[in-house]
Design a protein with these regions (language model features):
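Basic/aromatic-rich interaction segments and small domains that mediate binding to polyanionic partners
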Residues: 2-70
Length: 70
């Protein structure tokens, strides 16, 4: 499992509306391309998701949080 200096996006408690995050869009999952944006809505109801909490960004894009920008 890869580790980084950024906060874990797998735990819902770590992800808040208004935060800057890097997400991976559904269509970019295979290549791992990240998209940066501001969280507008949390879409995952569970407290933990192994692939990242699903969010909608302010620009409407939806993906799973890979890292939280400090």
């Amino acid at each position: 499992m890869a580790t980084s200096n950024s906060t874990n996006g797998q735990n819902r408690d770590n992800v808040k509306i208004g935060m800057a995050v890097d997400i991976v869009l559904k269509e970019d999952q295979r290549i791992g391309k990240l998209t940066r944006g501001i969280v507008a809505e949390l879409l995952t109801n569970s407290q933990f998701h192994p692939h990242g909490i699903k969010v909608r960004l302010q620009d409407g894009q939806v993906g799973r949080v890979q890292s939280i920008i400090n």
